[in-house]
Amino acid sequence: MANSQRKILVTSALPYANGPIHLGHMLEYIQTDIWSRFQKLRGHECHYICADDAHGTPIMLKAQQLGMAPEEMIAQVNVEHQQDFADFNVAFDNYHSTHSDENRALASEIYLKLRDGGYIKSKTISQLFDPEKSMFLPDRFVKGTCPKCKSEDQYGDNCDACGATYSPTELINPRSAVSGATPVMKETEHFFFDLPAFEGMLKAWTRSGALQSEMANKLDEWFEQGLQQWDITRDAPYFGFEIPDAPGKYFYVWLDAPIGYMGSFKNFCDKRGDINFDEFWAKDSSAEVYHFIGKDIVYFHSLFWPAMLHGAGFRQPSSVYAHGYVTVNGAKMSKSKGTFIKARTYLDHLDPEYLRYYYAAKLSARIDDLDLNLEDFAQRVNSDLVGKLVNLASRTAGFITKRFDGKLAAVADKSLIDSFLAKQDVIAELYEAREYGKAMREIMALADVANGFVADAAPWQLVKQDDKQEEAHQVCSNALNLFRILVTYLKPVLPRLAKDVEDFFRMELTWDGLDSDLSGHEIAPFKPMMQRVELDKVAAMVEASKENLQATAEPVKTGPLADDPISETISYEDFAKIDLRVALIQKAEAVPEADKLLKLQLDIGGEVRQVFAGIKSAYNPEDLEGKLTVMVANLAPRKMRFGMSEGMVLAAGPGGKDLFVLEPHAGAKPGMRVK
């Protein structure tokens, strides 16, 4: 081994358990998986841990819409997530859920330690409340205009446009994202984490090298604005963990979500039995803990999380690594264009190794966005993996099998092999630093050299000459040695290809074994290892993404539309036949013989109509007199046993007490046409 063994725990952000994985998500899991596989390839003890983030109001509401219990829904999503990851060759050592006994115990433990340390404050707050749904609105379920930059349609906790954080009550023109109703203020008791108490510690930690410089600079801006106490409470109804000693109060999902890293690792330790949880999480731990995350959740992972850990007596992360967003063809992922591609849709059409390589080729240690240009994707995979890498073996392996009994020669001139081996430290340093793009360029530069060597030597010409057989054997053996080194360098990125190459060489590809002498080593017959990317398959994937959108475009409706769907479409000509007029209710009286009817005398501007309206359950007759309303004036008269009804007034609502007669704004006059 090149260096002493390290103890490493690495995590990716926990995917939310209310929907499928897409290619934007996959960037992070591929990035982390490459790093984890590299550490293991180098001989280190590395554990890659993840879980589904399974709590919160969105989970609760989605389950309600599907007619399922939240526990049932998150269990189903967990299976789907794990299958997607497995098929992309993402090798977690443990994949769990935040809705677990381990996570409940750890969340309660951390909370109680923070409370005992004086870091939990209680106060009564005024919070937005949805009067239609009778529920307090979590910050992500309030939308409105950002109070900082004035961008519209922003969530109640932070602005996607400017990155500002704020409370939902600061939003301009807030509305409930659940019902669309204008929320009202209502008092409730909440618990707060005293984040400002950790400012000194956080300033030191964020400048300790634990963060990328871009992240550290962004945090300086937040420090200048001043840290705020963090509301860690949500009111029932809520799907999550109830706060100890506080019935009806639940932990905010962002409190127990990062603790999910610990919960999943605890589950892993208990299953294994030979790994000590405290060796990785105790305050004096010498192990390394790394979190890979997206840039949109930096605030939680670089302020709240280390402060919570410190206050509860645990260690802080060694580093938090953030990445940018994925764009497709230079633009934000789009459902209408078919570029919002689910992981499963990709897998239905293309090899996952293609995307693993393409992402690796474009990833750096910076927080830059990564563009998945689908045309470039096909060209790069075909050029690098098929044209350079696999082609190196396909052009030479057949000669070894057919002419030299499948055995490699002892390479007389090892200068080329030595030059490839000389790059292993450089490539290792690039992997370690998450500079995958630079590592891929180094490896592909070597592939160019190897292909140039084969092209110049032309073994297909040498084998035709009796006196050149040994030279042909040497050239092909040399080329396959170079191929083995290249695939070993790429093993963290292309695990499936590496396995195929291991079967071909009949040996494991190891970093320590890069300089193995393969003289006389017998190889298996060569089989095709990778197909070219066909653009028609890429196009089919995009088209399938559009079709998936068509299938799911109709959202699960809640509220009035769920109970009373919109009627079939009518033509404009049909609508134009309806004559709607403003009417003054001159007189209203109950119809004794009828349970639902009021008899109305309506003035429509020079003519008085008698109309029977089924609104008795919602209105007292005297409350209607003198009000304006809207009636259908050209409806054919209808003879009823109480008299003739000469039209219809318009009202909204499901019935009973929930009926609301339409009333024009001030200024409207009886007889005016409504159009």
UniProtKB/Swiss-Prot annotation:
Q: How is the cofactor bound?
A: Binds 1 zinc ion per subunit.
Instruction: Give the EC number(s) listed in the UniProt record.
Output: 6.1.1.10
Q: Which residues form a coiled coil?
A: none
Q: Motif 'HIGH' region located where? A: 15-25
Q: Indicate yes or no for the key word Secreted.
A: no
Residue ranges annotated for the tRNA-binding domain, each copy included: 574-675
Which biological process, per GO, is one annotated for this protein?
methionyl-tRNA aminoacylation
PROSITE patterns the record matches:
AA_TRNA_LIGASE_I (PS00178), TRBD (PS50886)
Motif 'KMSKS' region per record, residues: 332-336
> InterPro entries under this entry?
aa-tRNA-synth_I_CS, Anticodon_Met, Met-tRNA-synth_bsu_C, Met-tRNA_ligase_1, Met-tRNA_synth, Methionyl/Leucyl_tRNA_Synth, MetRS_core, MetRS_Zn
Whether Hydrolase counts among this entry's keywords is no
User: Per its Swiss-Prot or TrEMBL entry, what cofactor is needed?
Assistant: Zn(2+)
Substrates-to-products reaction catalysed = tRNA(Met) + L-methionine + ATP = L-methionyl-tRNA(Met) + AMP + diphosphate
Annotated residues that bind Zn(2+) are located at 146, 149, 159, 162
**In terms of one coarse class, where is the protein primarily found?**
cytoplasm
List locations, semicolon-separated: Cytoplasm
Q: Which UniProt keywords apply?
A: Aminoacyl-tRNA synthetase, ATP-binding, Cytoplasm, Ligase, Metal-binding, Nucleotide-binding, Protein biosynthesis, RNA-binding, tRNA-binding, Zinc
Q: Which HAMAP family match?
A: Met_tRNA_synth_type1
Q: How does it assemble?
A: Homodimer.
What family does the entry list?
A: Belongs to the class-I aminoacyl-tRNA synthetase family. MetG type 1 subfamily.
Q: What is this protein called?
A: Methionine--tRNA ligase
Species this protein is from: Shewanella amazonensis (strain ATCC BAA-1098 / SB2B)
The gene is: metG
